[in-house]
Amino acid sequence: NNKVLLIEAGGKDSYPWIHIPVGYYKTMHNPKTDWCYKTEPDETMENRSIPYPRGKTLGGSSSINGLLYIRGQEQDYDIWRQLGNKGWSWNDVLPYFLKAENQERGQDEFHGVGGPLSVSDQRIKLPILDAFMNAAEEVGIPKVNDFNKGNNFGCGYFQVTEKNGLRCSAAVG
């Protein structure tokens, strides 16, 4: 029964576009909700800078991102552990992923239920996306049904942090 105080430099998450999934078009690059960072100019890109949206509101970047729910690669976590970061192997962090999520697919060895973060399948499935995935498979890129099992290589529909048509963020779960 622990409580966590979340402190953010930005304001409350009362801006309506924060909660609407397509609202990231109105929150990214908006100084009210985004720090509006840019990368350093890169000579390999003709000295262009690329926007690097970071949330400036309660919930941080989880309040302005594209809602994708994709964990890191299992091997990356294991490398962190091998570098001396105890508690950071895939097997160490997986229980926390399970505890955090309320997975609409239900509980299994890679997903949990009852946590504060609602995770659901992407609702929009378009023929052009299916054609893209079929083409990728034809050239040897595997289809992935679940990007959160530790091996993200491939293409497929991702899951999102959304519940009842609204964004789930660090501020609202």
Q: Across the structure, where does each feature detected by a protein language model lie?
A:
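N-terminal glycine-rich phosphate/pyrophosphate-binding loop and immediately adjacent elements
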Residues: 1-99
